[in-house]
Amino acid sequence: MKTYINEIRENESVESLFLVKEKSSGITKTGSTYLRLKLVDRSGDIEGRVWTFAENVAASFEKDDFVRVTGKAVSFQEHLQLNITHIEKISEEEILFSDFFPMTERDIEEMFQSLLEVGRQIKNPHLSQLLQLFWEDESFIKLFKMAPASKWLHHNYLGGLLEHTLSLAQLVLKNACHYTGLDLDLLLTASILHDLGKVDELSYYRSFDYSDEGRLLGHIILGIERVEDKIRQLPDFPANLSTLLKHFLISHHGQYIWGSPKRPMTVEAVMLHFLDDMDAKINGIQQFLKRYIPEGSRWTAYHRMFDQHFYVPPLSEKVELPDKIEKDQLEEE
């Protein structure tokens, strides 16, 4: 039975399966070699130390291998670590990938069907045909369903890209109807395609990291390349529509300092940027709240990106709101 890292307590004996995220050697004060490991599963990470026969043990496995570990949890400088007495490499057939990599809590196929339903609301035949080419691309869809949306900022789990994309498309539907004169077809298409380059930018075979293409080009350029490749298969696709759609992709980060080659220059592009930013930040904060609230406290640990702590108020009584609020209810008495 798998013991997850977040279940390990001080002084407990541990025998479980882990993924080796980092591996290095050190020298003790007495001159002996020891092995330093970072072991991970879907619940977190823990440092492991091999104190005896470290050189022989180190030769038996490599970074990114799955291993079976026996040891004892001890506290060192207020952090748990494993003193390992036995470690051996195991094959992928002996593990469940869902034990090692964080995954969306939602059903992937249900989310994908919901995204297809959103896409069916697009009336523009050119944009509809463009999306259809992506839906028919089995290799792309396989990656799109499983990719994380980022390495650590938001939706950083398998299925995260699909979850974020669906959330953004649904936010577009809910907010666009509040305003007049918006091109909903273009907004919806852009919301579905805005981060598609992340299937190439991020590597997630053993851990979440950037691919060489991701580091050198980034998901915006990689996404533009995929869109242009599909548009070339549609000879009647209007050039001005192609330009506008690509503008959404290159501007959705909003500012040059955030990686956008251009700032949003249409009302729709501005809306996409702010909704995308909101969805990413809310998810990022929610993930942070799950992991970094000290026991007995209503304040989180310090969040470096937001440069602040977050307060978690007591749960208030749930209030059922009416589906529709009549106009006279909003008027001042």
Residue ranges, per PLM feature:
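OB-fold nucleic-acid-binding modules
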Residues: 1-14
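Divalent metal-coordination and catalytic microenvironments
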Residues: 18, 64, 168, 276
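OB-fold single-stranded nucleic acid-binding module
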Residues: 23-33, 44-47, 53-99
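Short, acidic/hydrophobic/Gly-rich beta-strand patch recurrent on exposed beta strands
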Residues: 36-41, 204
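Acidic/His-rich, divalent-metal-binding segments that scaffold phosphate/diphosphate chemistry
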Residues: 93-216, 239
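Divalent metal-dependent catalytic cores for phosphoryl transfer on phosphate-bearing substrates
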Residues: 152-155, 163-164, 174-294
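Acidic, carboxylate-rich catalytic segments that either coordinate divalent cations
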Residues: 268-333
